[in-house]
Curated annotation (Swiss-Prot):
Its main location: membrane. The lineage of its organism: Eukaryota, Metazoa, Chordata, Craniata, Vertebrata. It catalyses: Ca(2+)(in) = Ca(2+)(out). Keywords: Calcium, Calcium channel, Calcium transport, Cell membrane, Ion channel, Ion transport, Membrane, Transmembrane, Transmembrane helix, Transport. It is a multi-pass membrane protein. The gene is ORAI2. GO terms for cellular component: membrane; plasma membrane. Belongs to the Orai family. It comes from the Eukaryota. One of its GO terms (biological process) is store-operated calcium entry. InterPro entries: CRAC_channel, Orai_sf. It holds the Pfam family Orai-1. CRAC channels are regulated by fast Ca(2+)-dependent inactivation (FCDI), a mechanism that limits Ca(2+) influx and cell toxicity. ORAI2 channels display prominent FCDI. Inhibited by lanthanides such as Gd(3+) ions. It is found in: Cell membrane. This is Protein orai-2.
């Protein structure tokens, strides 16, 4: 660090000298203070990089677990659902259920693919107890893909999962107490199955709205927190610049 800054350091000097310390003039004290400030800033940058690494690793782990669970549930629901052959389902209902299940599985498998490809490389670096190994991790370059997997798994994937539950309730309950002969389905509210499916939809719609509102609120709170933290860092850098400018003017006077 001293070689890069071209500032000589006396190794016999104390770590935290005072400007009036015996054997060290004001010029040496200013140089030592400058080196300490730059070194502390370098360590803070490394700490920030490691925090980003651990955050990326946590997001990848959460995405992989969530995607594996929800995609597995969707596949089981598709395979295990038993359609009543004697009941004529509405065509839009079957098309919507098939499309929702396919998109749900595709989204979660894509998020799982990203997590599976990137997570081992991040884990390999995070398990090395060396501060300088942070540059070997691909989390900075792969940050857009990590955020994409996180969004697919926790936002879009969960919304599709809620829609999947609603459609599954309609397919499961709609034939209950319905007519067994072929023909158009009975009118709305005429049998128990239709009412049960309607109740599940009425319950799930507020849940979906609450989920969307919470997601937006959480994202805005997170952005506000990051903005405040960056503002504090900018203020600290500004104070450091003012202090260094004052030290340089003092050296010019001397």
């Amino acid at each position: 660090m001293s070689a890069e800054l071209n500032v000589p350091i006396d190794p016999s000097a104390p770590a935290c000298p005072e400007p009036g310390h015996k054997g060290m003039d004001y010029r040496d004290w200013v140089r030592r203070s400058y080196l300490e400030l730059v070194t502390s800033n370098h360590h803070s940058v490394q700490a920030l990089s490691w925090r980003k690494l651990y955050l990326s690793r946590a997001k990848l782990k959460a995405s992989s677990r969530t995607s594996a669970l929800l995609s597995g549930f969707a596949m089981v629901a598709m395979v295990e659902v038993q359609l009543e052959t004697q009941y004529q389902y509405p065509r839009p209902l079957l098309i919507a259920f098939s499309a929702c299940t396919t998109v749900l599985v595709a989204v979660h498998l894509f998020a799982l693919l990203i997590s599976t490809c990137i997570l081992p490389n991040v884990e390999a670096v995070s398990n090395i107890h060396n501060l300088n190994s942070i540059s070997e991790s691909p989390h900075e370059r792969m940050h857009p893909y990590i955020e994409l997997a996180w969004g697919f798994s926790t936002v879009l994937g969960i919304l599709l999962f809620l829609a999947e539950v609603v459609l599954l309730c309609w397919i499961k309950f709609l034939p209950v107490d319905a007519r067994r002969q072929p023909g158009p389905p009975p009118g709305p509210g005429s049998h128990t199955g239709w009412q049960a499916a309607l109740v599940s939809t009425i319950i799930m719609v507020p849940v979906g709205l609450i989920f969307v509102v919470f997601t937006i609120h959480f994202y805005r709170s997170l952005v506000r927190h990051k903005t405040e933290r960056h503002n504090r860092e900018i203020e600290e850098l500004h104070k450091l610049k003012v202090q260094l400018d004052g030290h340089e003017r003092s050296l010019q006077v001397l």
